């Protein structure tokens, strides 16, 4: 395997003991899925891994031990199989390699659902015989996000009326007979006509076929392509959506194409997976096992290196992976696991934790010092340290597991500030790492499809996330605040605002409450009036209820921010970056606010204004937070579409909680409000799940 040398340019740590020997250290390995990986031992030796000691080490995937081999040649390599996994949080698998004495078996019960294995094609036995295998491959790219699809939300290509999509299909060897293509797609439209969808498939301009189906939802459609229409190498696959009589629009999203084609054994490709039945001895007789390897991968977590002479019935179909010397894939990253720096360094009095990347936590320091001086015992933790304690993946579930542990370790823990932006693309298919600093949870809602929720971080006494759909009320243990920052500058400017507020410079001097109603519907004015009625006799109240069609509403609302209100509450239609169908106040206008007397708390009883997970659109919430000269100090806003009647349960609970602790903190209001809301229907549940507290949960109330 000398030709496998080179590997990747990994940073090599200095782990030498005083006696000159290498101290074993736990290692995190990132690798592409659905591939056999080889790592030169010289890249692992600095961490203490030696060929002679391989039995003293454990390789694991999400707590599940994974078999590995040391293939010893001129340059020995550690070899293991990286199975196909599917998660919205990652593109690559993360394996932990650690001394056996350090390994704690804790397999993730959800791992079996993360492993993906393509279904056998129709009539698979018709394609197999002694010496003939069915090569399998999957073509997909996650390029298009669709919140409203069911289950899977990432797609490769959009298929719509009179538009053409061209895909290059690479076939390693000329197929012996027909090639089977399985199209997996999601249809987003439907029509009374039957069928209401058609797709014209052309291969190399020599094969044309139209396929039809009916209705919305997922489709798996298999198409057989004659062998003479396919060539070894690049093939052009053209997809076109013709018009259909009685169908105004057709819209589908292609998720993947699974390819199956018969090939004579042994395979010619450097690394290829295939289906085969029967005894492979005759077909593979005489192959040089020192340069080619064969694994059975029916059990993706426990592949077996096999020899072709194993007796199997021709009807006993197995999955294999064939690898030549040059076919092994490389690991993309090898790095030591980080330990929790604050594991034993703080007392049980900790009441406030800030979590984020080191880069974003640094400018947060003045705020943490203020909270410490105000009587809260504070600590911080870098998010990478958390990931490395829980399987190594950058996922929200790791943060939740840590918070559950922290709550047991620190009984006084009450406030958690999550410092970092994220998007609906945490795996970074189409976005950057800067946009995905700290992940969140995703749920499916009634009207808006998939969106974010922070509730699982707050409720940590439940073993899994089933409680999101089953509990009659939510009783959070922790007040979670999200600061969706993507840069240190944003954190720094926001901290300066909070300091000015807490020191009294920008804290509202009056107790006035302002309610703004969208003029488009009478129900919004009704709700805003009812909201203000709850404050009567306790504080001064004001309303701004313009008439539909009025001009200059944006200037009117900007003027309201210049006044001294402790709370500004909006009731009405909304979108990610604005209030009102008529755009009565937008994110751009929020960015331009300047010279405010004070910074209010802003409550949004609308839709989507807290949808901070969009990678391209700045939400109204973010615009109000990041404005260094104005805007809001804390915001409660939704990441979803919900109904005004369902939102009313939230604003009633918030007012009651606020009034019961006027000298408390915004996080205290949030914690006491949620249990007051009976989750009587899915709409109310969506409201509670998707409304988010933005800013510091320990902010003192104005």
Regions found by a protein language model. Give the residues of each.
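Cysteine-dependent hydrolase recognition
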Residues: 9-702
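Bacterial N-terminal signal peptides
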Residues: 1-5
């Amino acid at each position: 395997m000398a030709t496998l040398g080179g590997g990747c340019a990994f940073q090599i740590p200095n782990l030498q003991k005083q006696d000159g020997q290498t101290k074993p250290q736990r290692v995190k390995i990132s690798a592409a899925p659905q591939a056999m990986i080889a790592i030169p031992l010289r890249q692992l030796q600095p961490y203490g891994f030696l060929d002679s000691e391989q039995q003293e080490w454990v390789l694991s995937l999400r707590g599940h031990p994974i078999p590995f081999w040391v293939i010893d040649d001129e340059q020995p390599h550690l070899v293991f199989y990286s199975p196909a996994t599917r998660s919205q949080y990652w593109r690559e698998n993360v394996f932990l390699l650690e001394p056996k004495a350090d390994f704690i078996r804790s397999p993730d019960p959800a791992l079996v659902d993360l492993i993906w294995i393509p279904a056998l094609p129709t009539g698979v036995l018709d394609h197999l015989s002694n010496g003939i295998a069915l090569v399998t491959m999957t073509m997909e790219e996650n390029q298009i996000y669709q919140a409203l699809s069911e289950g899977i939300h990432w797609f490769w290509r959009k298929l719509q009326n009179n538009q053409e999509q061209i895909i290059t299909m690479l076939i390693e060897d000329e197929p012996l007979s027909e090639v089977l293509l399985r199209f997996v797609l999601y249809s987003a439209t439907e029509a009374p006509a039957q069928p209401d969808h058609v797709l014209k498939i052309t291969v190399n301009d020599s094969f044309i076929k139209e396929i039809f189906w009916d209705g919305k939802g997922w489709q798996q459609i298999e198409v057989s392509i004659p062998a003479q229409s396919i060539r070894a190498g690049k093939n052009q696959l053209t997809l076109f959506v013709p018009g259909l009589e009685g169908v105004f629009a057709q819209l589908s999203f292609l998720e993947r194409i699974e390819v199956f084609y018969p090939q004579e054994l042994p395979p010619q490709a450097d690394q290829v997976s295939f289906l085969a039945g029967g005894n492979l001895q005759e077909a593979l007789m005489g192959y040089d096992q020192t340069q080619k390897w064969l694994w059975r991968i029916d059990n993706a977590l426990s592949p077996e290196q096999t020899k072709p002479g194993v007796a199997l019935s021709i009807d006993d179909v197995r999955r294999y992976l064939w690898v030549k010397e040059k076919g092994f894939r490389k690991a993309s990253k090898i790095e030591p696991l980080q330990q929790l720096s604050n594991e034993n360094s703080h007392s049980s009095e900790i009441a406030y934790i800030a979590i984020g990347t080191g880069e974003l936590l640094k400018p947060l320091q003045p705020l943490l010092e203020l909270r410490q001086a105000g009587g809260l015992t504070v600590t911080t933790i870098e998010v990478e340290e958390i990931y490395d304690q829980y399987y190594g993946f950058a996922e929200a579930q790791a943060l939740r597991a840590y918070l559950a542990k922290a709550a047991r370790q620190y009984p006084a823990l009450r406030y958690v500030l999550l410092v970092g932006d994220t998007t609906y693309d945490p795996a970074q298919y189409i976005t950057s790492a800067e946009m995905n600093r700290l992940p969140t949870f995703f749920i499916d809602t009634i009207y808006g499809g998939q969106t974010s929720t922070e509730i699982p971080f707050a409720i940590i006494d439940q073993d899994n996330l089933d409680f999101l759909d089953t509990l009659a009320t939510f009783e959070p243990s922790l007040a979670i605040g999200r600061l969706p920052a993507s840069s240190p500058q944003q954190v720094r400017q926001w901290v300066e605002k909070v300091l000015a507020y807490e020191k009294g410079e920008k804290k509202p001097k009056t107790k006035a409450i302002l309610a703004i109603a969208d003029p488009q519907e009478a129900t919004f004015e009704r709700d805003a009036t009812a909201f203000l009625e709850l404050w009567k006799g306790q504080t001064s109240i004001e309303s701004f209820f313009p008439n539909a069609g009025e001009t200059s509403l944006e200037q009117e609302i900007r003027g309201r921010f210049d006044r001294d209100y402790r709370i500004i509450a909006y009731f009405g239609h909304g979108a990610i970056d604005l209030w009102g169908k008529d755009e009565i106040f937008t994110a751009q206008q929020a960015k331009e606010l300047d010279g405010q007397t004070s910074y209010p708390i802003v409550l949004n009883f609308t839709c989507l204004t807290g949808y901070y997970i969009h990678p391209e659109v700045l939400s109204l919430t973010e615009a109000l937070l990041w404005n260094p000269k104005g805007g809001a100090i804390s915001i409660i806003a939704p990441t979803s579409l919900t109904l005004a009647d369902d939102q009313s349960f939230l604003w009633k609970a918030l007012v009651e909680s606020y009034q019961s602790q006027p000298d408390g903190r915004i996080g205290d209001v949030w914690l006491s409000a949620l249990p007051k809301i009976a989750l009587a229907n899915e709409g109310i549940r969506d409201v509670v799940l998707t409304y988010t507290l933005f800013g510091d949960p320990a902010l003192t109330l104005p």
